[in-house]
Amino acid sequence: MKKIPLLTKIIFHISNIGLILLYLYPGSIIGWLIYGDFQKQAKITSDFSIISSNHVFAFIILSLLGVFSFTNKKITFLFLYLFFISIALELCHILIPKRSFEYSDLFGNFLGVFLIFILLKLYQFFKSR
């Protein structure tokens, strides 16, 4: 039974490193994979008004992996880390060539983490009743 949390923890850390690499690369690796052009940003899904849907989905997945990987004692730290890294990575775009800071990306990051946070709190609330 301990293999599942270990596996999800490994996947979480690999996904985290992968996301950091995608964020910090000066250009779009996904754009290169899809369009053959590092300059073109990939639009995998349509945005939600002023919120980047790609960022929402990326941080939902990362948050879910984190929730399934860590114990309740570390969940608070996990969410603080996810909120911090979502801000820090987007701010890094100010300094990275061919990248730019965008509020829609930052809001997408926040929304992805926040949705999982709310779902976890609702689950914990109903489980304790």
For the regions a language model picked out, list residue spans one by one.
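Bulky hydrophobic segments
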Residues: M1-P97, F101-S104, F110, F114-R129
